[in-house]
Amino acid sequence: MKLYEYLVEGTKHFTLIDPDKSVDYLKIAKYALEAGTDGILVGGSLGIRESQITQVVKDIKSIAHVPVVIFPGSISQLTDEADGVLFLSVLNSLDPYYIIGAQIQGAVLLAKHYPKLEVISTAYIIIGDGGAAGFVSMSKPIPYTRPDIVMAYALAANYIGFKAVYLEAGSGAPQPAPPEMVRAARRVFPRILIVGGGIRSGEVAYTIAREKPNVIVTGTLAEEKPEKLGEIIRAIKSA
């Protein structure tokens, strides 16, 4: 099955592993797999080389029975060991480099050196706190209180033709995207909708899952309290 077809069906849980933060990335991956995660995202906003991400993906693939997908923080974070890559465009960045500049460079690299890697074009929309991703990409995060603005961005992403929209509250965010914000994006975007950042409990995961995103991502929780992953995943599956 193609990665796109896998992602667009139902609501899944993905675990984000940032090798720059997690020395014990295999331990986190094992926890996540045992808890029932549906996939692994690998990447981060800072300090990851191509050789590093290649080794991390190879190691995780050796134990994983689910897709392992690159979540790149820069054009150096690519490897053909993965099942696919989220080809991110930060729609609300104030710097054109993060909207289209890096994508031009990355597209050439993908075509020349990673032709077998499945590419999922992804409109990356920073909300709320934004975290490191918002800071590094020089974004103007959308306030939690403005689902109407998120809807406008998601509608634009739909008309442009992105395969996915990713609502990102940021790593370790104080709160996740509120349900009404997820609902607003879902109303106008018919393909893959991803929500991540600030999800720390089964109750919160359940309220988000009820809005029918395709993927709910947890990262900081997996690093700090991996034993809670089971609670999150069960809540998503029960929604």
Curated annotation (Swiss-Prot):
GO cellular component: cytoplasm
Enzyme class: transferase
MF term (GO), any: phosphoglycerol geranylgeranyltransferase activity
Binding site for Mg(2+): 18, 45
Alphabetically ordered keywords of this record: Cytoplasm, Lipid biosynthesis, Lipid metabolism, Magnesium, Metal-binding, Phospholipid biosynthesis, Phospholipid metabolism, Transferase
Classification via Pfam families: PcrB
Catalytic activity line of the entry: sn-glycerol 1-phosphate + (2E,6E,10E)-geranylgeranyl diphosphate = sn-3-O-(geranylgeranyl)glycerol 1-phosphate + diphosphate
Major localization listed first in the record, in broad terms: cytoplasm
Any single biological process term in GO: glycerophospholipid biosynthetic process
Transmembrane intervals: none
Cofactor(s) this protein cannot do without: Mg(2+)
Compartment(s) of residence: Cytoplasm
Bridged cysteine pairs (disulfide): none
Pathway: Membrane lipid metabolism; glycerophospholipid metabolism
UniProt record similarity statement: Belongs to the GGGP/HepGP synthase family. Group II subfamily.
Function, as annotated: Prenyltransferase that catalyzes the transfer of the geranylgeranyl moiety of geranylgeranyl diphosphate (GGPP) to the C3 hydroxyl of sn-glycerol-1-phosphate (G1P). This reaction is the first ether-bond-formation step in the biosynthesis of archaeal membrane lipids.
NCBIfam families registered for this protein in UniProt: GGGP (TIGR01769), GGGP-family (TIGR01768), PRK04169.1-2 (NF003198)
Listed name of the protein: Geranylgeranylglyceryl phosphate synthase
Organism, as annotated: Pyrobaculum islandicum (strain DSM 4184 / JCM 9189 / GEO3)
